[in-house]
Amino acid sequence: MGIFMLKEILNKIFWHPDYKREDFEVVILHRGAEENKKAISLDDVELKGNYLIYFDTYIPLHRILEIRNKKTGEILYKKK
């Protein structure tokens, strides 16, 4: 799955009425964090172009390692 598929998944979560952003989180590559990974609720970010905006931080989409449903544990995207 490339960036195109990743953006499709994110757009669906952000804009489709059947999905709630607060039910999902992204795991990103975050150097210095435990195992260099950090989980962020999609309710706390904005999607702008090829970036997630988390407060004042721009996170390039290529840093997303995983998208998962917090309630069910379902993994919608996992970087190879």
Swiss-Prot record:
Pfam family, any one: MJ1316
Superkingdom in the source lineage: Archaea
Transmembrane regions: none
Family matches, as NCBIfam families: PRK04257.1
Family of the protein in this entry: Belongs to the UPF0248 family.
Protein name as it appears in the record: UPF0248 protein MJ1316
Species this protein is from: Methanocaldococcus jannaschii (strain ATCC 43067 / DSM 2661 / JAL-1 / JCM 10045 / NBRC 100440) (Methanococcus jannaschii)
